[in-house]
Amino acid sequence: MRRRCSSPHRQVIEIGRRRLPADSRRKAIARFATGFAVLWLSLTWQISQPRAQIVSSPRELAIIRINVLDLLVHEQSLPLPVKQRRDALWEYYQEFGGELLWLGSRRPNELLARLQNAASDGLDPKDYPSKQLAGLAAAKSTDDKRSLALVELFFSAAFLEYASDIKVGRFLPRKIDPNFFIEGRTIDQTAALKSLAGVDSLDRFFSAWQPSNPRYAALRSALANYLALADKGGWGSVPLGEALKPGMKDPRVPAIRTRLKLSDGVGPSRVEPEIYDDALVDAVKRFQARQGLESDGVIGASTIVAMNVPLQERIQSIIMAMERLRWMPEDLGQQYVIVNIAGFDLRRINGGNVEE
């Protein structure tokens, strides 16, 4: 079972329409920072010395790798994120003769960028020790090989944490809802490290590593669009009123058009601005189908209410959908069924094709 931590502050984040303690990583990060502080005090002094050199030569890297193995075998006070992954780290660095992944490469900056932009993966950047890692990245110029070995292990531990969250989810399913009968999964951490060693960039690794379900990629793309909309201020509300049918004239039409321009890309009116024209009807039908409503093009109360759902709530729904897909088996087989309970909709997938 994957570890989940608690915090005395009991902060919460909203996942879909549920609320869950947002401290799943906070205590781990705090412990990470405690071990980091001791290392950082040592490294800060050493970086200030004129003899410090940036690690580059194969000989230096080989010496650091020896120190990595020694730490994993003999060090009893390893920081918690490293200690929890000691076996996998040992298996990679010793049994597979693993090369150093972080020192002498550009990967630390790539990992930092990924963690700081975790929102694009539907994850919370505050759940990851970016600031601590940034300090360690700056410490790569020290000539203390044992301290550099700890830097290597810190980055590997942080990478494995994020790789796990993207692959199998950051929360246990039953922590979200006790009625979810899905067992939490774990990743092969050694395999993740070996895969990372075989590619030239973290982006390439994560593109291949994230869930392969096409719906996941579609949700990630939609999330990027909605986050961009949020940065621009989101969308306004549409007033309720009488049902609006195709061809009718109504002062709410411009507001509806503006709303659907943001989410569905509908263009400007080719007739009078207040006329509910064919182009807008098509956009409304697409919107209704996506929301599980009857896609008849009639804008009634249910359609207006759906349009007025706050953007942040839509974003949280996408994030929750991405998390659920991470819980699912990687291979669903050639045939499976998707049920949309809210929309009273069932779809059979056969060989990648949707059968209504």
Description of each model-found segment:
Residues A33-T44:
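Bacterial N-terminal signal peptides
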Residues Q46-A52:
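Sec/Tat signal peptide C-region and signal peptidase I cleavage site
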